[in-house]
């Protein structure tokens, strides 16, 4: 596997942070290459936060660049070694740049918190708008249906028991009749103390561009 595809990197330099933070990320990356370790065994900088991502048969680490305050929940901005950027809000993708398919200007409504959604009997319907590149498709409106599902028996989840998490499935409410319809998204949520944190997700940006992500190291 190409070492450039499996090193983690990023942060302060690209996110406008201090030089020392950026140096720390690069030093970690250089050490990782030198040791030739796989991602799952890599010694990570404890001062940084990571996502373990699988995409197109590759496993990569993304580093948290910064947090963007938002009335509907903090947006986490994550970077890869290839300068790909993924934005997550409450576990949902609200931006992706640098991949073969890109989402921009994603708008979400104010959504119930995950514990409340977990207690729902009926599927929860909601709408999202997004701009998609390439193709210059602006203002695509998706009507989605979210419901709980049994823990997945097969997934890219590592280091956690699927049965300890609450699982959700998110489908296009029109059963895929829309030209913009995408494969099903899934979320694994850790619920404790009345709070819910998405620790694992499966998302497609297009029918051909799908990835999984997990907060890493597992359980941190």
Regions found by a protein language model. Give the residues of each.
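Processing junctions and N-termini across compartments
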Residues: 9-12, 120
